[in-house]
A protein has these predicted regions:
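Amphipathic, charged alpha-helical segments and their helix-to-coil junctions
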Residues: 1-11, 15-16, 23-25, 58-102
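Surface-exposed, polar/charged faces of alpha-helical domains
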Residues: 27-34, 38-41, 45, 49-56, ...
Length: 102
């Protein structure tokens, strides 16, 4: 992950989604949007390859990846659970992960 994306995550401008992709949270410049799009294109290509090899759907692979990506969200960073509500991770607060991650 680039330093710009890491900084944007720390500022709450970019967050991890429940489906394995990054998203812009609120207002962001074009450069940041392009970086998020590029990461999501790479993730989608990886998920597609894994889905083909495993005989799974793209969505299933993305959701499985989310189960690994969501725990990487640090305190102060944003994430979206399967209810599609954006949350900010707080110190001492349990991360709300989708049921399929348990």
């Amino acid at each position: 992950m680039s330093a710009a994306i890491a900084e944007a995550r720390a500022q709450g401008l970019v967050g991890e989604r429940f489906d394995g992709y990054l998203a812009i949270v609120g207002d962001a410049g074009d450069q940041l949007r392009h970086q998020v799009q590029a990461i999501n294109i790479r993730r989608r290509a990886l998920y597609s390859d894994l889905a083909d090899r495993r005989g799974a759907s793209l969505e299933q692979v993305g959701m499985t990846a989310a189960c690994q990506l969501l725990p990487t969200v640090h305190v102060g960073e944003r994430y979206q659970a399967s209810d599609k509500v954006w949350r900010t991770r707080s110190a001492g607060q349990e991360l709300l992960v989708p049921d399929y991650c348990r």
